[in-house]
């Protein structure tokens, strides 16, 4: 095969044409031969041809290979699709579609929601799974530790929690400090079920634009950012007080790959959680998210803390 510049490009020994198309849906949609595409373009473009957990598509593929999988919070655009997949959300499918229509989201992939809890209570799920996946979900949990333990209790021994997590450096959380072990433990000891005023102020007043390339270029703040902070803080307090103790959807936690791994490691050593960090991948250039796999070791006992 003649590649670009007339060079002969041999295929990697472990190249799988079908997997290449699954990892690169734009190639599949174009109807291009996967072997030809990889040899002429894919290699130079750094296209994935093996499933690994460092990307959204890769971690989805690994999770979908489990005998049974649960996706938390799919909304109308699930990461996992298949007969082996169940879904948990705070709204029914009908309500998700209604909400999606209100905000202009595509509804063609809206899944049937197998488990519905308006307050996000995972304990209503009456089955165990080999894999659980969530995308941009864990940062919304008022009690980070409780969430991890609830997931662990849904996993079979040896099962894994697959996560797609925003990297605070490259999303609208760029102006907020990374979360500390003190904050995470305090939220758990308090039994926090709704977000704190601190989280509300951070989310409504201190967030910035959500353009990853600009963040990667070091341009995280608009010229009007500083001048707007004070007025936004007042509005944040009003929104929190107006909630009258109810749930307001904001980010409670901010991580980078390094601080997330450190957090999980510390919580394990403190015996607050029973999941261990098996893989935590760096954020890809130009992206605003990273991936992680937390494993439930065999002989793991149920944690209720």
Regions found by a protein language model. Name each.
Residues 44-48, 299-304:
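Short, charged/polar, Gly/Pro-enriched secondary-structure boundary elements
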Residues 53, 69, 274-276:
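Eukaryotic beta-rich interaction modules
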Residues 51-67:
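Active-site donor-binding segments of glycosyltransferases and PAPS-dependent sulfotransferases
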Residues 10, 131-142, 249-254, 281:
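Short, charged/polar micro-motifs that form catalytic or ligand-binding hotspots
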Residues 1-56:
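Charge-rich, low-complexity intrinsically disordered regions
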Residues 107-121, 146, 150-156, 160-300:
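S-adenosyl-L-methionine-dependent methyltransferase catalytic module, highlighting the catalytic core
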Residues 61, 67-175, 292-296:
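Conserved SAM-binding loop
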